[in-house]
Structures are given as C-alpha cells and as structure tokens.
C-alpha cells in the first residue's frame, strides 16, 4: 500500500468498475462487486489489490498472486487460480488508470505552516517557508527561505535545507544537507500508451535519504514508482544531478555534476561517478566501481572496476582504443597525406 502520510486512498472501488475503466473483460463467474482497495506492483499484490503483468520474466513469482491482474489474453492462463485475470490489450495503461482512481497525492494545503506540523526545539525557518500537513522537523534543523516541504515529510535532526528547495514524499535522516533549488520527491518519468494518447503512470513511492547525505544545488531526485528511491548514508551528490525513480544508491558514493542515473539502477557502496556520466535503466554498479567523466554505462559494472567511454567499457580497453584511433587518424597514406586529411 502507498504510504498514507503521502497518499490518500480513494477506494474501495468495485472490480467491475476498474475493469470497465481499463477496457478489460471480467471472466465468467468473477464477482464484479468485489472491492479493490489499492493498486500494487506484482511483488506487493494482495487479495484486495489490482496489479498488471506485461513481462513473462515475472512468471516464477506468480504462484501466490491474489486479487486481480490486468493481462493480455495470451497471459491470462498463467495466473494462479486465486487471481482474477482482467484481459485487456493494454495492461500497463489499464493499471495506470486504476491507480489514478484508487490513490491521490496529499496536497500541501493553503496554510503556510499547517496546524499539525511538529517542530523540535532549535528549528530555524527562513522567510516564506511552507510546511504541509503532518510535517515533522528534527532538533536543530535549518530550513532556508521559500523552501516548500510537502505533506507528511519527515526531516531529521541537524539538517540544513537550502533556499527554494522543494521536498515531497520524502523521509530524511539526520545531518542531511540539501543545497539551494534542489527538488526531491517529484514524480518519476513514467508514461504508457492509452486509447486517447499517453497516460502518466502514478508514482506511488517515496524518497529515503539516509544520515549525512549532501545533495547539491538544483539536483533532482524522483520518488519511486511504487518502491522507494534510496540515497545511502554519507553519499555526496554534486549540483545538477538527476536521479530517477526506484534508484538505490549505497553508502559513501560520490556523484559529480551532471551525472544522470536512470530508473531502477542499483549502485553499490563507495561507487564514484565523474561529471556528466550517464547510466541506463536497470543497470547494477558494483561496490567501489568508478565511472569516468562523460561515460555512458549501458550494462552492469563489476565491483571495484573503472570504466569509461561511450558505450562504457573497462578503462584500459577504452584508453587503448582511443590511442589506436588517434594513431590511425594520423597515419600517412601512400601519397604522404594523413589518413584524416582530405586536403
């Protein structure tokens, strides 16, 4: 279930209504009046949830699946008896519409400081700070001018939140430092096709920032699609870094400016990223790995290795290839001209 501190539950909704919304057919004998209370991904589905299946790599985990599941016709037979198949041409789009119907992000509200905000002793608030309903701020924390802290956010002790920072759907540990203009907890980039065009997929997760993390100015960290985006203890992130939904960053990592981490990347402890490094989605970066500046990582990097280039590869291979290309470009042909010289 989405964290109730951040999301309102709008259900329950009858199964027949969700099926109609997603353009799905109820199987014969299914109880259309059955109440569905939440949308969930497969790993978290329960008897009163609706989920979806689009990739057969998840089949081994379906044995105990319950509730209802949007599927294409070819996959309906693989669902266990305890799960109701909702057959549709677009399971992901149907799930997105169901999630929008069942859940809604909590609003900040009209009060600059909501009446139920909890501030421990020694908290300092700059001019124009907005604190939404249910916000909790730990002892000795400073929040700079015009920062906006969304509903339900918890900030630990001795934190420093810079001017114009936006925090939402987030839980912060102690001694976290966030520089001016950073945006934490906005929806991750997720869309799928629908009958009337693209549909935004609701992002129902959170951002967890552990103790001692530093986040640079104008950096953005998206909340999870359903699970959490996690920034590990004592990790240091430079300005203008983008971290997408569901990313899990280990402890003591370093990311230089303009690094971009795509969705669902796993980063081990002590990994380092040079400026403008980019990582494709669902890649694993091992503990202690190093990624060179401007590298484009398209596959897993083993622990302790250093990679560079585009596409990224072990640094020695990349340096050898770069040196070879330079030599070939400067070779003189039979006419005495350089290979790269058309003059």
From Swiss-Prot:
Enumerate the InterPro entries for this protein: Hexapep, Hexapep_transf_CS, LpxD, Trimer_LpxA-like_sf, UDP_GlcNAc_AcTrfase_non-rep
| Superkingdom of this protein's organism | Bacteria
Which terms does the UniProt entry file under GO BP?
Answer: lipid A biosynthetic process
Thylakoid listed as a keyword:
no
Q: Which Pfam families match?
A: Hexapep, LpxD
Broad enzyme group: transferase
Give, as in the UniProt entry, the pathway in which the protein acts: Bacterial outer membrane biogenesis; LPS lipid A biosynthesis
Q: Might you report a single GO cellular component term?
A: membrane
Q: Which GO terms describe its molecular function?
A: N-acyltransferase activity
Q: Which reaction does it catalyse?
A: a UDP-3-O-[(3R)-3-hydroxyacyl]-alpha-D-glucosamine + a (3R)-hydroxyacyl-[ACP] = a UDP-2-N,3-O-bis[(3R)-3-hydroxyacyl]-alpha-D-glucosamine + holo-[ACP] + H(+)
Q: What is its EC number?
A: 2.3.1.191
**Catalytic residues (UniProt):** 245
**SUPFAM superfamilies in UniProt:** Trimeric LpxA-like enzymes
* Alphabetic keyword roster: Acyltransferase, Lipid A biosynthesis, Lipid biosynthesis, Lipid metabolism, Repeat, Transferase
The entry's function note states: Catalyzes the N-acylation of UDP-3-O-acylglucosamine using 3-hydroxyacyl-ACP as the acyl donor. Is involved in the biosynthesis of lipid A, a phosphorylated glycolipid that anchors the lipopolysaccharide to the outer membrane of the cell.
Its family?
Belongs to the transferase hexapeptide repeat family. LpxD subfamily.
Oligomer status and interactors = Homotrimer.
Protein name from the UniProt record: UDP-3-O-acylglucosamine N-acyltransferase
> Which organism does this sequence originate in?
Phenylobacterium zucineum (strain HLK1)
């Amino acid at each position: 279930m989405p964290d109730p501190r951040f999301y309102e539950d709008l259900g329950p909704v009858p199964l027949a209504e969700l099926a109609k919304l997603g353009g799905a057919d109820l199987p014969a004998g299914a109880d259309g009046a059955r109440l569905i209370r939440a949308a969930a991904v497969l790993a978290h589905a329960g008897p009163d949830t609706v989920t979806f299946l689009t990739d057969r790599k998840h089949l081994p985990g379906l044995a105990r699946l319950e509730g209802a599941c949007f599927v294409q016709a070819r996959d309906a037979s693989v669902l266990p008896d305890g799960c109701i198949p909702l057959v549709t041409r677009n399971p992901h789009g149907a799930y997105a519409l169901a999630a929008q119907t069942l859940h809604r992000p909590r609003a900040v509200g009209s009060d600059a400081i909501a009446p139920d905000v909890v501030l421990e002793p020694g908290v300092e608030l700059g001019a124009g700070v907005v604190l939404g309903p249910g916000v909790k701020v730990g002892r000795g924390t400073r929040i700079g001018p015009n920062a906006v802290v969304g509903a339900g956010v918890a900030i630990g002790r001795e934190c420093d939140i810079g001017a114009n920072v936006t925090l939402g759907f987030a839980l912060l540990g102690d001694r976290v430092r966030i520089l001016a203009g950073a945006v934490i907890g906005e929806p991750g980039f997720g869309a799928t096709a629908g009958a009337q065009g693209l549909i935004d997929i609701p992002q129902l997760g959170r951002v967890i920032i552990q103790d001692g993390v530093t986040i640079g100015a104008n950096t953005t960290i998206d909340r999870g699609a359903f699970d959490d985006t996690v920034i590990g203890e004592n990790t240091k992130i430079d300005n203008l870094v983008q971290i997408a939904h569901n990313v899990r960053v280990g402890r003591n990592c370093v990311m230089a400016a303009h690094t971009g981490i795509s969705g669902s990347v796993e980063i081990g402890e002590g990994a380092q990223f040079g400026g403008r490094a980019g990582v494709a989605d669902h890649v694993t970066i091992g503990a202690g790995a190093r990624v060179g500046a401007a590298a484009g990582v398209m596959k897993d990097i083993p622990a302790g290795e250093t990679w560079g280039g585009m596409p990224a590869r072990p640094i020695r291979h990349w340096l050898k290839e770069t040196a070879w290309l330079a030599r070939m470009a400067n070779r003189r042909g039979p006419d005495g001209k350089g290979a790269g010289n058309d003059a």
